[in-house]
């Protein structure tokens, strides 16, 4: 993970432990192109070769936020299974309600599948910086909508979170 994102993640994990006594753990962070290819190809096999179906769950190599060093799949220490049920755990609920305080967003929320293109992933957080995370949380919109609407059609670098000057 990038250093700024990794520091924020450590702060988030410490706050969760302090506030509700739950230990969060990193499950999957930075991925190389090769690792993402393996993950994608494995999903492709599990869904019978349908790229359309695989694309709902796993980013194609070269298109994964994990390759940016800004995303982390998180779990609770008691289980590292990446399933929708994580969202119903104390840790999952805490992440959903509090990750923005540390500059993260819950990237693939329930009900946003048609906008994000991915199924609900309560374990997948994406670092966007504290200012952007607070604005996204307040607006209750996915990153795609924020990048277009909240900044008034201004181009925003999704890696740095800074406005791109013309």
Segments the model singles out, each with a brief description of its role:
Residues 1-166:
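Cell-envelope/glycan interface and biosynthesis
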């Amino acid at each position: 993970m990038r250093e700024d994102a990794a520091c924020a993640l450590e702060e988030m994990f410490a706050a969760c432990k302090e506030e509700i006594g739950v230990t969060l753990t990193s499950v999957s962070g930075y991925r190389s192109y090769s690792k993402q290819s393996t993950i994608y190809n494995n999903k492709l096999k599990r869904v019978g070769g349908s790229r359309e179906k695989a694309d709902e769950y796993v980013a194609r190599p070269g298109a994964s936020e994990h390759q940016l060093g800004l995303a982390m799949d998180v779990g609770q220490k008691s289980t590292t299974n990446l399933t929708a049920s994580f969202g119903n755990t104390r840790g999952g609920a805490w992440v959903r309600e509090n990750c923005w305080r540390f500059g993260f967003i819950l990237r693939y929320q329930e009900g946003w599948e048609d906008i994000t293109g991915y199924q609900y992933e309560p374990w997948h957080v994406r670092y966007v910086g504290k200012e952007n995370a607070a604005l996204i949380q307040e607006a209750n919109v996915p990153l795609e909508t924020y990048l277009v609407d909240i900044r008034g059609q201004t181009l925003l670098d999704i890696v740095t979170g800074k406005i791109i000057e013309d």
